[in-house]
Amino acid sequence: MPPAGGPRAPRPAALPRSLSRLRECPGRSRIVLALGATQMALGCLIVAVSFAALALTTSARVRHSCPFWAGFSVLLSGLIGVVSWKRPLSLVITFFMLLSAVCVMLNLAGSILSCQNAQLVNSLEGCQLIKFDSVEVCVCCELQHQSSGCSNLGETLKLNPLQENCNAVRLTLKDLLFSVCALNVLSTIVCALATAMCCMQMVSSDVLQMFLPQRSHPANPTCVTPHGTVLHQTLDFDEFIPPLPPPPYYPPEYTCTPSTEAQRGLHLDFAPSPFGTLYDVAINSPGLLYPAELPPPYEAVVGQPPASQVTSIGQQVAESSSGDPNTSAGFSTPVPADSTSLLVSEGTATPGSSPSPDGPVGAPAPSEPALPPGHVSPEDPGMGSQVQPGPGRVSRSTSDPTLCTSSMAGDASSHRPSCSQDLEAGLSEAVPGSASMSRSATAACRAQLSPAGDPDTWKTDQRPTPEPFPATSKERPRSLVDSKAYADARVLVAKFLEHSHCALPTEAQHMVGAMRLAVTNEERLEEEAVFGADVLDQV
């Protein structure tokens, strides 16, 4: 129980103001309890006296007019009043008020009937004990002055002879009926008071709330409902304004704004690929998009070393500085000397270059084949990459798909013509029937991308007309190992093209479209390559 000076419990918000005031005022609650208990006592007395009067007489008039039904209604009303004191609910209070009003009318009728019967019994003074078939009955009637007998024309009253004196029974019945009349009158008064009190309490609170201003009560802060809660808010859906959505949890990854693209690397989230497992390279790394080393050639896999090899055709373009996360490096690829094809160099946008199978990146080989006269160097002379002339046409192994990517930092203009010159040189040197490039290698070199640009330029020509390809050899991987590396490299190129949303020049867009077409055409011949490689391995 809280102390006298402590804060009181807050009023239930769901109850009306009248009910809350009833709980706050202990005097009114005690009055309701007293009225309910009085009604219960009066009801019990009315019922008991009425049944006692019924037991003394067998007359139909008295029995039919005995108000025991008024006693039951008052008893029920008093019970509801006690419940309303214990639980001051709106429904219980209203029901108590209505039932008290009904009891007022019933008690008025009962009091009138009981008083009339009492006067009747009082007027029948002459009582005689009469036996009917061994049954004794007291018959009371009006006394005639001329005779001592009862008149058949007047009213008669039959009483049960509980004792020898019939006059004593009549007097007892008269007293009981007068008692019932008095109890009904008292019950009428109590029920009227209960009805008036409940009605005044409910109506006065509504009238005061309607006409009088709201008074400020210096209530305890703990008892006051804080403003802004659901109890003080009325939701108006017409004026409801939805709250602002929260900011995105992750910034956009593939925006190609020139100011921001040069400051950060290209972060691509690739799905787990067997290519990374095969060559121990984390494909999902934000700084390393693909391995810095191409798959080994078929001759090295089967144990047939070529006569001479060409190594390190692309050297490291620029060393990574402390503040620049992107660097450019070249691939080091062994190339057989007896091949008859164009040698293509490419760059990669990885944080570094892995050493080649024959030596470190950038170290020239003892003997490097020379390019034909008139061939343009695929790399800018200022970038530090050179290609030395060699005998005839040389080519990579057919299992090595050539990839050509862009550097994500630095001057984009120095890299754009590089792949274009390389592609033009390859097309001019390739002749029908030679194994200069596979379709995927040629298309990959066409896909050299610019690191910055407007994304709308990329969307201008989504389906360019592919340029005619020179007739190339349709050699396929001749082993399951080469087939696996070939398929993984092709998937990696396709994913890189799929995530490239930066702007490209017009000629580069045509190259990318041709590369997409070449990658699509290679899918049909994959099953044939696997089957042929399996046959060669069995032989």
From Swiss-Prot:
What InterPro entries does the entry give?
Answer: CD20-like (IPR007237), ENTREP1-3 (IPR030431)
Q: Which segments show compositional bias classed as Polar residues?
A: 306-331, 395-408
Does Transmembrane helix show up as a keyword for this record? yes
Q: Topology versus the membrane, per the UniProt entry?
A: Multi-pass membrane protein
Regions of compositional bias (Low complexity) in chain numbering: 347-365
Give the highest taxon in the source lineage. Eukaryota
Tell me the compartments it is located in.
Membrane
Q: Where is this region: Disordered?
A: 301-481
Gene Ontology cellular component list: membrane
The protein's UniProt keywords, in alphabetical order, are: Membrane, Transmembrane, Transmembrane helix
Name the residues that span the membrane.
Answer: 31-51, 65-85, 89-109, 176-196
Family that this chain belongs to: Belongs to the ENTREP family.
Q: What is this protein called?
A: Protein ENTREP2
